[in-house]
């Protein structure tokens, strides 16, 4: 996976009176940081002689895993929660060759548990959170790339759901630098409103859950959309929540990780 672009955001910087950079994971092949995870996970699966790989997902990992599995000639299995179904995403995942299982289940954590049990039984490589260190290491590469490109940044802000992404960033974080995670209860940002904490045991080891994880309100998500649009960027709600929440931080040299493209959320974006 090639380095994603790091850009300075002059209009967002002016609005917040801070220096703000954006790490554009949206430029990865399927438009999200999950591509980094998929490539490493598939390589690990092949090394261990698995013929098939699978995950439970709200969207981005499912699309990414389906895409790269076909390239690397592996079968892929995707578990989706019925309440999270995006028809466009579902069609895309199926068109990429994945076998899809849709479950009526109350939350994402339970879907992780169910799918993990089934994958173990069916000898499918498990790409769910807390199953392989490759998920963590893939995200560590993001912060390594930022440090290599920029010496001023000392604060990193990203979205959080199950924990793998932010744990990977934390692994590469330098001493005295700051890392914050944004979550939301808004129905607009479904990928970060379950806040499943599937990596909970690791999260409480490395973060102060009350200080380091910040809730974004719906108005902040909309503000994030507007600010990103002013820079010519259109991103998924989770990334808009990150940019729209910068007023909550005192730090002056900040990098926001723009984790996903709006292309998988175009219908909701129209609304």
What is the role of each PLM region?
Residues 1-271:
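PLP-dependent amino-acid enzyme catalytic core
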């Amino acid at each position: 996976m090639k380095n994603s672009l790091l850009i300075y955001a002059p209009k967002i910087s002016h609005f917040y009176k801070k220096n703000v950079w954006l790490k554009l994971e949206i430029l990865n092949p399927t438009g999200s940081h999950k591509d980094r995870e998929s490539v490493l996970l598939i390589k690990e699966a092949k090394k261990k002689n698995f013929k098939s790989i699978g995950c439970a997902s709200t969207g981005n990992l499912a699309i990414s895993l389906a895409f790269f599995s076909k390239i690397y000639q592996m079968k892929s299995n995707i578990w989706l929660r019925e309440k999270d179904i995006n028809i466009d995403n579902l069609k895309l995942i199926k068109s990429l060759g994945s076998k899809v299982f849709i479950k009526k289940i109350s939350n994402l954590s339970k879907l992780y548990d169910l799918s993990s049990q089934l994958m173990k039984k069916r000898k499918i490589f498990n790409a769910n959170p807390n199953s392989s260190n490759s998920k963590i290491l893939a995200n560590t590469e993001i912060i390594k790339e930022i440090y290599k490109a920029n010496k001023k940044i000392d604060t990193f802000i990203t979205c959080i759901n199950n924990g793998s992404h932010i744990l990977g960033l934390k692994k590469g974080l330098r001493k005295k630098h700051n890392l914050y995670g944004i979550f939301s209860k808004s129905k607009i940002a479904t990928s970060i409103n379950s806040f499943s904490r599937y990596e909970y045991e690791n999260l409480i080891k490395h973060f102060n859950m009350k200080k380091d994880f910040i809730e974004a309100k719906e108005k902040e998500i909309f503000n994030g959309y507007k600010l990103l649009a002013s820079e010519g960027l259109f991103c998924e709600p989770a990334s808009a929540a990150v940019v729209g929440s910068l007023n909550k931080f005192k730090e002056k040299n900040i990098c926001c990780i723009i984790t996903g493209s709006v292309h998988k959320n175009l219908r909701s974006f129209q609304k």
